[in-house]
Amino acid sequence: MKVAVLQFPGTNCEFDAKYAFTKLGCDVEVIWHKDTKLPENTDLVVVPGGFSYGDYLRSGAIARFANIMEDVKKFATNGGKVLGICNGFQILLEVVLLLGAMKRNDTLHFISKYHTLKVIDNNNDFLRLLNIGDVVNIPVAHHDGNYYIDEVGLKELEANNQ
């Protein structure tokens, strides 16, 4: 599997992602935000966490204008798989590859803790080795982690098993 991991000024997890996918046997290339094309035969694009461009305006707001994002949008629109981790998820929201938006945490404080999730669907490449009903603990760390989507958007996600 060929994995392209994006790198923006301020991201800090691109080499963690490269390490993890390399350990899984993937061919991984880190792609600088000013590049305009993903590597040929890319199977997966990973948009990593951190604080792209310092998150000065809004998390991911500036990164959405990076040169590479046009090719990422084209890749995703043509059925390519894209994984957004932390700030990467926020970037995907800003570039409108995902529905919804991120808001500040209700507490208005930075949150860093483990969160328990229950697997309700494993019909995808990321969860296929887990069983429905499995419980996993994942670390979360964010200031803008309050995902919001309107009712129409939520119904669309549910209809697409997303």
Language-model segments: residues:
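N-terminal beta1-alpha1 cap of cysteine-dependent amidohydrolase-like domains
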Residues: 1-84, 92-99, 103-111, 118, ...
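Residues that flank catalytic or metal-binding motifs in active/ligand-binding sites
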Residues: 87, 113, 134-135
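Short, flexible active-site-adjacent loop segments at beta-strand->alpha-helix junctions, enriched
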Residues: 88-89, 123
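Short hydrophobic/aromatic residue motifs in ordered secondary structure
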Residues: 89-90, 145
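Short loop segments at secondary-structure junctions
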Residues: 96, 120-123, 143
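Conserved catalytic micro-motifs used in adenylation/nucleotidyl-transfer and phosphoryl/amide-
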Residues: 116-128
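C-terminal and late-domain segments of enzyme folds
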Residues: 127-162
